[in-house]
Amino acid sequence: MPVPVPPMKWDGWGDPALAEPLSDDITALLKNALGVSAEDIDAPTIDEVRLRPSALTESDEGALAAVVGADQVSTRDGDRLRRAGGKSTLDLLRRKSREPQDAPDGVVVPGSDDEIGEILNVCSRRRIAVVPFGGGTSVVGGLDPVRGEFGAVVSLDLRRFDAVGLDEISAEATLGAGLPGPRAEELLAERGYELGHYPQSFRFATIGGFAATRSSGQNSAGYGRFDEMVRGLRVVTPAGVLDLGRAPASAAGPDLRELFLGSEGAFGVITALRLQVHPVPEVRVYEAWTFPDFAIGAHALRAVEQQGDGPTVLRLSDEVETGIASALEGQSGSGGCLAITVFEGT
């Protein structure tokens, strides 16, 4: 059985079904601003990419299949390639290579905390590195199949961890780590709530990925970074399962939640999170402001933030980003910097 993958380009960002060719204006902008060559370079198709052979032995595959079932373990090149890294510029450039590429040696799709614990123990005994995988949108190398002293690497796909629970009294939601951001918001909206976390990777990233990377989003000015929304989390390690943050607050000193938030999966596998949510706002007011330059814009936005009770979205683009945004909209632009604000309420 094929291992499920998110509907995203294997060698780029976005859903391939929604891809559009670059306009002449954007192509000209890339040439002038970045020195991009006028010639198109043929990249390999997914069928032309060559991967280094899997280092998993038949015994390794059998041990993993004994935990999750043979249909939830794959060493097929297509499954390995789609989990070979994230979506940084370096990741995507590597995918253009016609030389043999590195990739995890296998993909394992567990369905419970117990299965993850057993997988970690199997891999520990067999010296197999484990890389947790959610939506595949990392831009900091968190998904690289680094072997080091290990004989092989497996990608631990968490897409089956998609449970949702809502405590309306405490305004907290318990979400599975493999739940994609859009699906989480859709399910919460059915009950009149939202998480309100919208990073640029939102369409493909998962709840666990938000936590493992300490994600920030466009609403972070109002609701805080993702780690500020976390009230509790469950982590599976080779030594057992940790349920952290059982109470809303604690007077204890060290907070073990901080060890795993932003850890990129290095210390354990996050499988569920309890998160602060809020009612969907009745009103949203969108406003845009222009400033002569970035310094003046930054001074104005700093004053707004220091006053308190500011907008949910408070974003200032520098001169270059403002110019590119104008070009993408087919506008010539008039220079300066653009600020976007969103106010929410009843």
Feature locations, PLM:
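Short, surface-exposed ligand-recognition loops at beta-strand->loop->(often short) alpha-helix junctions
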Residues: R52-A55, T290-I296, G345
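Residue-level signal for inorganic ion chemistry
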Residues: L64, C123, G240, T341
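Short, well-ordered beta-strand elements within core beta-sheets of diverse protein domains
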Residues: G106-G111, L275-Q276, V285-P292, A339-E344
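Short hydrophobic alpha-helical runs that function as membrane-insertion/retention elements
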Residues: V131-P132
